[in-house]
Amino acid sequence: MKLNVIRLFDPWRSSLCTCPRKYSLHPYTGCSHFCLYCYATSYIGRKPSTPKVKFLERVKGDLEFIEKDAIIEMSSSSDPYPPIEEKVKLTRKTLELLLTRDVRVLITTKSHIVTRDIDLLRKIPSAIMITVTTLDDSLAKLIEPEAPPPSLRLKAIRELNMSNIPVGVRVDPIMPGVNDDPYLIAELIEVVKEAGARHIVTATYKAKWDSLSRLSQAIPEIAGKLRELYVHSGVKIHGYMYLTRNKREELLLPVVKTAIKLGLTVATCREGLNSQYFQAPSCDGSHLISLSPRSKININRS
């Protein structure tokens, strides 16, 4: 079976990936949010969001071969709700297609535009993961220059929760010297929990040369620290520069402890850490789909 635009999710064929079986679907190539830390730019370049050619037609063809109750995620690397989505509505039209099939939907986004589609999401077994790396709008503007500010993302979390659509938050990535203050992290978890988040996914920044250069240029006072931690002291895993295991545990533990204290499920993403850092049925938040009013399926970590 050869699929066209719906692809089995298999990041780098990595043993560190703990996601359940799912498919990824990207209505757009590139991403207009232009986050400095983006890993996808290392292989697709830094390009604005562009609708894929004949995308809906290709999705329709692929859906003929997708098994019942499959999880389809939009999107793992290119945000499904870039600014252009308000006009072209490609993601919305995709949801309308998915609504005609027995599939489950996981949406990962930084955009409040997702709330526009609440009417459709209430009809599909679905869950939403919204990325919030900081509560500071000015810091977010620096590291995620064209993404909606955290204040709008928090508003979206509240609106989704009030509409009974399960929502979680990705505190990802955590970057040394940028957004790693444990007190601010604890505050972030508390605020998103109050807004309605039920699950937290977290991960440390995995460096590529292009993203490392962007961060160093934007925040020159941390350039030396990043180079020391990633280039000199770090470890290479699947072509990415990782922090040492001890450093990753140090940065992620405040997230995990605060989430557990507040009664949230929590997991890390592609970190290879022990079970203390994985306190959830799934890492990606797909288990939240079982809480959707339209879902009768329980998702277990495989």
Q: Where are the regions a protein language model picked out?
A:
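Hydrophobic faces of well-ordered beta-strands that scaffold small-molecule active sites
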Residues: 70-72, 105-107, 128-130, 167-171, ...
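Conserved strand-turn element in the central/C-terminal portion of the radical SAM core barrel
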Residues: 146, 159-181, 238-243
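Conserved Radical SAM active-site core
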Residues: 1-129, 133-138
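Auxiliary Fe-S-binding modules of radical SAM enzymes
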Residues: 2, 183-302
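Conserved radical SAM core fold
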Residues: 73-82, 113-115, 128-147, 174-176, ...
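Active-site glycine- and acidic-residue-rich loops that bind
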Residues: 107, 175-188
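Surface-exposed amphipathic alpha-helices with a cationic face
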Residues: 95-99, 122, 157-164, 256-260
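Charged helix-capping and loop-helix junction motifs
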Residues: 88-90, 151, 182-188
